[in-house]
Amino acid sequence: MSLEEKFYKKNVELQNKVSAEIQKVNEGLSEKSIAQLQTILKELDSMKEVKGLIISYPRIIIDSWDYSDSLGLELVELAEQYKKVSKY
């Protein structure tokens, strides 16, 4: 599986996780910001289509989420993969 294929697969997986987190916020089961989650979801979707975007969500996560949040860690890792994929 190529780097781009791995990135795309992980992106789709994380979009599903972010959507599930938005649902948890709506149900009162999560205290994350719905606005932040929606921004992240939009950027993830854009990242599938366009290489080289300047994405803001890693800064959002680093600045305001718990450093050990597993979803946050996965999202920041995906941003790093995106940088690598965008170089090609």
PLM features: residue spans?
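Amphipathic alpha-helical binding modules
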Residues: 54-88
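Extended, non-membrane alpha-helical segments enriched in charged/polar residues
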Residues: 20, 39-42
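Short terminal alpha-helical segments
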Residues: 1-30, 82-83
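Short, charged, amphipathic alpha-helical segments
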Residues: 31-39
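Amphipathic alpha-helical coiled-coil segments
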Residues: 43-54
